[in-house]
Amino acid sequence: MPYEFLEDIATADIAFSAWGKDLEETFIAASDATMNVMVENLDSIQPLERREIQLQNEALDMLLFDLLQELIYYKDSEKLMLRIHQIQIKKEEHQYVLKAVALGEKLDPNRHPTRADVKAVTLHRFQLVKTDRGWETQIILDI
């Protein structure tokens, strides 16, 4: 599990740190951590529905922010619990472009015991940094 929940960062919110050897791995880890805040067992989410996500942003950290917000949007608008299965991040001219395939299914309380209802990603202490081992992010979610 390339993420950990940070108990001492926020009281009414949930904070976590996620990491990976490259940007793609880090974005997937942060996406999984966000879903894991909402659903106890990520493996209970079956790949029954597919959504293609395409995002652009001039700032790399805000591209991650946008991706997590997109997953929360699908949860709120379609009751879809999605996990990122393929992702590509590249720099094109003056912006970063993300293309991802998310797979999942509609939330079923009988099969998906829930933990918390994530409302949004906050910008408070939000960061994405390159490290000796790859990339690391710290994120606080509003619940």
Q: What residue spans do the PLM features occupy?
A:
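N-terminal intrinsically disordered, cationic/polar leader segments
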Residues: 1-143
